[in-house]
């Protein structure tokens, strides 16, 4: 399976179509397109250049061997999650601002988790595969939320429930990934995480 390549082609096609046929984009639509592009770079940094992020997760979190087919398939699940996080706000974000807060929260989460991963995953250098693009995502996520707040876009409930939209989508993605791995549940993962932190 060429999940990463398929995701890249589809995402770039969408970005190209937007550039060709939509003359004026709102700030929120520009943000959605920008995040889509960032996610392409992030997936390649995690998976190929330099790559190795899945191997670190496999070793330190799952603590079990995964075949290459499962690894590649997991990226397809991740790609679907990213499509939801970028396409939905592109079309509906101006009407329902919480759909913008959700991917912004996702961007912030990515930036934080990759920094935490430096210590948790025990990397030899202060770097985890995907760190550079993740920090750009973090800045972008904070930036759009600040812009929305300053320009009074959305109500309090958009900022309150937007992160929960992200969490709901993220949990669905994780449950799908756990089902693909098979034989491992959240309790096992949490136990592995606790043991890993206890060993630090």
What are these regions (language model features)?
Residues 26-43:
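Loop-to-helix transition at the N-terminal end of transmembrane alpha-helices
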């Amino acid at each position: 399976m060429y999940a990463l390549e398929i995701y890249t082609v589809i995402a770039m096609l969408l970005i190209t179509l937007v550039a060709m046929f939509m003359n004026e984009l709102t700030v929120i639509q520009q943000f959605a397109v920008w995040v889509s592009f960032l996610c392409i770079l992030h997936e390649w940094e995690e998976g190929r250049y330099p790559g190795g992020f899945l191997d670190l997760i496999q070793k330190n979190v799952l603590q079990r061997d995964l075949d290459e087919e499962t690894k590649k398939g997991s990226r397809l699940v991740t790609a679907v999650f990213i499509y939801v996080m970028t396409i939905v706000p592109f079309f509906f974000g101006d009407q329902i601002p919480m759909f913008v807060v959700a991917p912004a929260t996702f961007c912030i989460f990515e930036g934080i988790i990759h920094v935490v991963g430096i210590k948790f995953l025990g990397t030899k250098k202060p770097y985890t595969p995907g760190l550079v693009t993740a920090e750009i995502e973090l800045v972008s996520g904070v930036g759009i939320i600040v812009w929305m707040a300053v320009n009074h876009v959305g109500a309090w409930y958009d900022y309150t429930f937007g992160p929960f939209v992200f969490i709901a989508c993220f949990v669905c993605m994780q449950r799908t990934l756990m089902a693909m791995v098979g034989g491992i549940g959240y309790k096992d993962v949490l136990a592995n995480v606790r043991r890993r932190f206890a060993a630090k």
